């Protein structure tokens, strides 16, 4: 019998299994030669889908950025990330292949890796052995050393931004917060994730990005060895205070030499903190030298020679455009002057690194593309007519996209037609609040997943102080590139979307916007049509000024929270009594414009209200108690005649996700007519409001518990939530209708949908690992 058929008795026909590819997909979406398939993840700046080359079958991760849904600042960070990824070619850094675009979308074709996030790996395995932790740590340090050698600071290192390939080797992703730190200048933008951010960043002080990365590396190493974070608290203000003090418990099972390394990296004083060079000479780091790691072997280098350029006419327009996206070379006259200088400087190093990348991997137009009928198909960003190192112009490619023009208003600097068209269209772009609403991640998974926060409006990386270029050697060595990958997302809009709003120029200033949230820290939900984004709620005042205030507030919150998949924690707000006891004298940081400190005052409690009519108070109280008793693993206590305190804790699943939900239930009489007496003489039911207030724990689980209680109070016979909670107690995972197929980030395709929109990945008392904002997951 053939494996492809099934015989039936009595002359019944054979049933053939369907052919795996009976016919090509009717509505297949293409980005260049890549056919878009399943969604891999969702980040702050875009969705990520799996792309498969239509001829070679090569897999890539395609990040889809909706330019109409993101603020100009976020789009500018995407352009900056593109430029930075062009600078970095290292075996442990995620690689950028190509960039495509049309009027509405930007498509980043990234390396695809199949091992997922280091965070998920750590949650699954628990704390790692010192040997395995050292392997990961050495790969991270190797990649960081390469980045820092070219003045690139990541600024958002955390296990969620570290991907694993099929051989469990590290790929650093999400350079959305990365910045060039030129010369001896310091950075000013407070960005990152509070659990991994260093004290000087939290305080809002100027800081050295390289030393900030070292602190984050120390926290990551601690998490690898312990399975928990050194600083953690359900209350955001308390968490930030712990980070500023820098006091943490060192478990006894960590090897003594590794303990000294951790204390040297997680050091409050930046000047005393270990540098990369000191880390690489540390005994514990060197202890792994006998452990072979082919990925750490130095790859064959490529020497990049620098020379002076006698005239502006020899400057490559594509390279200049990439340098402008970096944000620290805005003074065009100074940039041209430094490039023409005979002295060695940072500008020339960056210029020739980008030029070398362009010459070795030229971006040409695709050949033999599949036939498409898209109205506005994605077009590849191809090179402009390129100058050789000897000033001779190379043959021009046959494409309208590769022509260059001279921008008379910018001193005659060459500007590619693509960028010039975008600048011409920018003046027509709508600047409504809803037009800049959605913020997805900036990591290649999402991410790139992370926005940079700033209180004062600053374009791009304008917060970085521009210092004089430090001398650099005339030759730079670039390692040959190796295999890489990564990606994660949600159902993206089709590349052929007919929407015609014109995009703004990626290089133009943009607000540091993000995703407007329906409540202070609620998770943004995908719209029914799959478009990633939501419309912000009206401002309290309802006026234009209020809308602007609301937009700015949402931008601030989103900038702090970063990627939706890991930053959904319901932060606790300090009480009025606590805040009244704090003064600039008792806490000097309150007087500073630190984004961490200011964010606290913007948060509010999470509450759910239920109005009940024609039910007496005694009946409502009885129904609430009955609902409490019907939910497994829920305990309650009576605070007063009309108040209850409840706690729900699931007993199934890994201990790392057993964060209890604590909430309070208050019953109050609403305004309304006096209840009329019943025929039997008892008073009739009035109008009562039942308020459920989350005290601590995962927001998503809190909502599910409240839905179950509401079903009881409304006398609903169909109560699927009760069964869901029971399944959860037994370790089963459920996915509510409409929940995107994502987990922890919520990366789609992950098996645990219950975590997809949980506010926090979080822990039990003895073993817990927290995501960037420390929000515990169920």
Curated annotation (Swiss-Prot):
Reactions it catalyzes: L-seryl-[protein] + ATP = O-phospho-L-seryl-[protein] + ADP + H(+); L-threonyl-[protein] + ATP = O-phospho-L-threonyl-[protein] + ADP + H(+); L-seryl-[tau protein] + ATP = O-phospho-L-seryl-[tau protein] + ADP + H(+); L-threonyl-[tau protein] + ATP = O-phospho-L-threonyl-[tau protein] + ADP + H(+)
Activity modulation notes: Activated by phosphorylation on Thr-189 by STK11/LKB1.
Protein name, as recorded: Serine/threonine-protein kinase BRSK1
Domain UBA stretches: 314-356
Bias kind Basic and acidic residues: ranges: 362-383
Compositionally biased residues, Pro residues: 491-508
Organism lineage string: Eukaryota, Metazoa, Chordata, Craniata, Vertebrata
GO molecular function: ATP binding; gamma-tubulin binding; magnesium ion binding; molecular function inhibitor activity; protein kinase binding; protein serine kinase activity; protein serine/threonine kinase activity; tau-protein kinase activity
Modified residues (Phosphothreonine): 189, 529, 535, 583
Outcome after substituting residue 63 to R: Abolishes kinase activity
Tissues expressed in: Mainly present in brain. Present in presynaptic nerve terminals (at protein level).
Subcellular location: Cytoplasm; Nucleus; Cytoplasm, Cytoskeleton, Microtubule organizing center, Centrosome; Synapse
Pfam families given in the database record: KA1_BRSK, Pkinase, UBA_BRSK
Residues annotated with Phosphoserine modification: 193, 399, 443, 447, 450, 508, 586-587, 601
Limits of the Protein kinase domain: 34-285
């Amino acid at each position: 019998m053939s494996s492809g058929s099934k015989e039936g008795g009595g002359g019944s026909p054979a049933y053939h299994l369907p052919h795996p590819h009976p016919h090509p997909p009717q509505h297949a979406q293409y980005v260049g030669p890549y056919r878009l398939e399943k969604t891999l993840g969702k980040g702050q700046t875009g969705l990520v889908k799996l792309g498969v080359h239509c001829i070679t079958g090569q897999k890539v991760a395609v990040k889809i950025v909706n330019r109409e849904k993101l603020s100009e600042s976020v789009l500018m960070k995407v352009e900056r990330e593109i430029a930075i990824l062009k600078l970095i070619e290292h075996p442990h850094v995620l690689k950028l292949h190509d960039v495509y675009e049309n009027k509405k979308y930007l498509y980043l074709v990234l390396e695809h890796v199949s091992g997922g996030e280091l965070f998920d790996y750590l949650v699954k395995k628990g704390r790692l052995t010192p040997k395995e932790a050292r392997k990961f740590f050495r790969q991270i340090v190797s990649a960081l050393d390469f980045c820092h050698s070219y003045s690139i600071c990541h600024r958002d290192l955390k296990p969620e931004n570290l991907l694993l390939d099929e051989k469990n080797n590290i790929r650093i992703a999400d350079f959305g917060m990365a910045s060039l730190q030129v010369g001896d200048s310091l950075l000013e933008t407070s960005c990152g994730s509070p659990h991994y951010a260093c004290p000087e960043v939290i305080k809002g002080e100027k800081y050295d990005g390289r030393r900030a990365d070292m602190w984050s590396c120390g926290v990551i190493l601690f998490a690898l060895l312990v399975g928990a974070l050194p600083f953690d608290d359900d209350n955001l203000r308390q968490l930030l205070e712990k980070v500023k003090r820098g006091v943490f418990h060192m478990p006894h099972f960590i090897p003594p030499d590794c303990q000294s390394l951790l204390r040297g990296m997680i050091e409050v004083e930046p000047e005393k903190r270990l540098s990369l060079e000191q880390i690489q000479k540390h005994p514990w780091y060197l202890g792994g030298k006998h452990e072979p790691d082919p990925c750490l072997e130095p790859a064959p280098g490529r020497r990049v020679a620098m020379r002076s350029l006698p005239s502006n006419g020899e400057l490559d327009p594509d390279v200049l455009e990439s340098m402008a996206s970096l944000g620290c070379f805005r003074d065009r006259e100074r940039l041209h002057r430094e490039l023409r200088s005979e002295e060695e400087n940072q500008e020339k190093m960056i210029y020739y690194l980008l030029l070398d990348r362009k010459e070795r991997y030229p971006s040409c137009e695709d050949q033999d593309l599949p036939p498409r009928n898209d109205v506005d198909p994605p077009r590849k960003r191809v090179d402009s007519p390129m100058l050789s190192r000897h000033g001779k112009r190379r043959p021009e490619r046959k494409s309208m996209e590769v022509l260059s023009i001279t921008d008379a208003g910018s001193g005659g600097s060459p500007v590619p037609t693509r960028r010039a068209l975008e600048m011409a269209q920018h003046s027509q772009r709508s600047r409504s609040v809803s037009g800049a609403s959605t913020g997805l991640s900036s990591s290649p998974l999402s991410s790139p997943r992370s926005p940079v926060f700033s209180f004062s409006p600053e374009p791009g990386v304008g917060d970085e102080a521009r210092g004089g270029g430090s001398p650099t050697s005339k030759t730079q060595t670039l390692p040959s590139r190796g295999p890489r990958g990564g990606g994660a997302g949600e159902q993206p809009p089709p590349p052929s979307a007919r929407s015609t709003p014109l995009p703004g120029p990626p290089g133009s200033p943009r607000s540091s916007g993000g995703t407007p949230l329906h409540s202070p820290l609620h998770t943004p939900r995908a719209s029914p049509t799959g478009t990633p984004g939501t419309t912000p709620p009206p401002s309290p005042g309802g006026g234009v000024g209020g809308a602007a205030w609301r937009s700015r507030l949402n931008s601030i919150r989103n900038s702090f929270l970063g990627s939706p998949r890991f930053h959904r924690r319901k932060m606790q707000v300090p009480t009025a009594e606590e805040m009244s006891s704090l003064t600039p004298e008792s806490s000097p940081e309150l007087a500073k414009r630190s984004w961490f400190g200011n964010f606290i005052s913007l948060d509010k409690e999470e509450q759910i209200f239920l109005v009940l009519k024609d039910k007496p108070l005694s009946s409502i109280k009885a129904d609430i108690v009955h609902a409490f008793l019907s939910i497994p693993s829920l305990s309650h206590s009576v605070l007063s005649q009309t108040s209850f305190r409840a706690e729900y804790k699931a007993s199934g699943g890994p201990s790392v996700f057993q964060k209890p939900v604590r909430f309070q239930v208050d019953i109050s009489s609403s305004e309304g007519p006096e209840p009329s007496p019943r025929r039997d003489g008892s008073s009739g039911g009035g109008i009562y409001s039942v308020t459920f207030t989350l005290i601590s724990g995962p927001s998503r689980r809190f909502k599910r518990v409240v839905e179950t209680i509401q079903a009881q109070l409304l006398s609903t016979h169909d109560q699927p939530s009760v069964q869901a909670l029971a399944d959860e107690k037994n370790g089963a995972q459920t996915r509510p209708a409409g929940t995107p197929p994502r987990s922890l980030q919520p990366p789609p395709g992950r098996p645990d949908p219950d975590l997809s929109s949980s506010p926090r990945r979080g822990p039990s008392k003895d073993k817990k690992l927290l995501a960037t904002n420390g929000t515990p997951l169920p």
